[in-house]
Regions:
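Conserved short internal alpha-helix adjacent to the catalytic or cofactor-binding core
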Residues: 1-3, 58-59
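RecB-family 4Fe-4S metal-dependent nuclease core
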Residues: 8-10, 14-310
Length: 310
């Protein structure tokens, strides 16, 4: 191309990440030798009047909320428009068939294992607190949960490799937990509570009775311990435990996340002052439902609007 009497050479001055890009050495050499000159930009410059598009101002007063779960209320707190779209309009993404087992599948499986284990342990008083018997019972529960879930052996291998550490860490935590006088109450039970014109609903992972007679509401987590601790760093910003506490007619209860880790063992992360946080949450729910009924705009939160999900 350089043999022609005239040639136009174009190059990018920056990449997609904003980093500057220099022309190729050949082009730089031509510029230094006077063999190339910057051409004039042939594009016409135009002044365009901005015409911003306002975010949607949805109103949910014609779609009354009758049942409210912890995850639904979390949607409302994070992004009212998301709540309107998913919970009131019922818009959902089409489900995709996946043959890979992910962390969520492992979490569901673990919930099932612990439910089977604790119910069997509570039903057989002869087992006591012997570690060998509990290990055998936990393995039976794992096998039963795997069969019920229909999980393929090959796909489950990564989690199967981590299971012994998870199991042993949990049993050690359980022994320490029971040493305080705590006793298993029930697991995976659906709860409902009328609140004005709506009904609060949810399935609580586990409820124990403590030595002083009070109740401990628990929710299992398989995430990193730092993530779990971050949930309770600002108590009033955590929806889940306070919501589950609202489903229990008890003013002396406690609530905690039980982080079932693969490497660091199982740890309890208490939600401090959960009764006070629960009362604040209930007040907030009443207020928010009244605003929706009165026609308040369901605005989109910018931080979520940047990642469309509808």
């Amino acid at each position: 191309g350089l043999q022609l009497p005239y040639a136009e050479v174009l190059w990018r001055e920056g990449d997609d990440g904003g980093e500057p890009l220099l022309p190729r050495p050949l082009v730089q050499a031509l510029q230094l030798n006077g063999g190339a000159a910057h051409g004039a930009d042939p594009r016409d410059h135009r002044t365009i009047t901005p015409q911003p598009t306002l975010p949607p101002q949805a109103h949910g007063s014609e779609l009354p909320v009758q049942r409210l779960s912890a995850s639904a209320y979390e949607d409302l707190r994070r992004c009212p428009y998301r709540f309107f779209a998913l919970r009131q309009l019922g818009l959902k993404e089409a489900d995709e068939l996946e043959d890979e087992v992910d962390k969520r599948d492992f979490g569901l499986w673990l919930h099932a294992v612990l439910k089977i284990f604790h119910e069997a342990l509570a039903a057989d008083v002869t087992l006591g607190d012997g570690l060998a018997a509990r290990l055998a019972l936990m393995e039976q529960a794992a096998a039963e949960a795997t069969r019920a879930a229909g999980l393929p052996d090959a796909a489950f291998l990564p989690f199967a490799a981590a299971w012994p550490q998870v199991r042993d860490g949990y049993l050690q935590w359980l022994a320490e937990h029971e040493a305080t006088g705590a006793r298993f109450g029930w697991a995976e039970r659906w709860q409902e509570l009328p609140l004005g014109s709506i009904t609060l609903v949810g399935q609580i992972d586990r409820l124990d009775q403590l030595a002083d007679g009070s109740t401990l509401v628990m929710d299992y987590k398989t995430e990193s311990i730092g993530t779990t601790q971050g949930r309770v760093k600002t108590p009033t910003e955590d929806t889940q435990l306070a919501f589950y506490a609202a489903l229990q007619p008890d003013d002396t209860l406690q609530a905690a996340y039980v982080n079932v880790g693969e490497k660091g063992g199982t740890k309890t992360v208490l939600q401090p002052d959960v009764v006070d946080v629960r009362d604040v949450l209930i007040t907030g729910i009443r207020h928010d439902m009244e605003r929706i009924t009165s026609g308040a705009a369901m605005a989109a939160a910018v931080r979520l609007a940047e990642t469309p999900e509808m």
